[in-house]
Amino acid sequence: MDFLNYPEPLADLITGLSRLPGIGPKTAGRLAFYLLQQPQVAENLAEAMIRAQREIRQCSLCCNYTDHDPCPICTGEKRERTLLCIVEQPRDVVSLEKTREFKGLYHVLHGVISPLEGVGPEQLTISKLLGRLEGVQEVVMAMNPTVEGEATALYLSRLLKPLGIKVTRIAHGLPVGGDLEYADEITIARALEGRRQI
């Protein structure tokens, strides 16, 4: 999209919005004009973004996003501490928590192993994971059913099995190439119930 005819601040806003995932130049333009017509919405959005950047951080235990460290899940007294679920992203924790089926703790990798994108085990939170396994009896791999998700689950299972930890994978009630974030609660709950040892 050609922004040459727009004032520089508007062109910068459109460019910035178009860098967000799933937002192309046309949608970014529509959003920019909406925000110009709704100054209170724009101001509230800007304040919320600044506040989130300032206050949200990774939990020092599970690496999920939180405004309290450690996060409420890690400090929850009713959580099953012998059960740990490994997920790719913080939004996957939200999807699993919506089902109310999983009672254990989580560990967020913040990605998957993807050599083509230059992401190896060192770029993920695997070292923190290995440092928090004391007392854990079962690890549930809840990576998305993609080639990278499967490769990451296999890599982690090879690290964890020699430690005597039972390693399971959620059942594939999820479509290949799909994300936990977009699955409904029933599908995720069935996938958790049907997890299998790997």
From Swiss-Prot:
The keyword Metal-binding applies. It comes from the Bacteria. GO terms for biological process: DNA recombination; DNA repair. It comes from Desulfitobacterium hafniense (strain DSM 10664 / DCB-2). May play a role in DNA repair. It seems to be involved in an RecBC-independent recombinational process of DNA repair. It may act with RecF and RecO. The lineage of its organism: Bacteria, Bacillati, Bacillota, Clostridia, Eubacteriales. GO terms for molecular function: DNA binding; zinc ion binding. A zinc finger (C4-type) spans 59-74. PANTHER family: RECOMBINATION PROTEIN RECR. This is Recombination protein RecR.
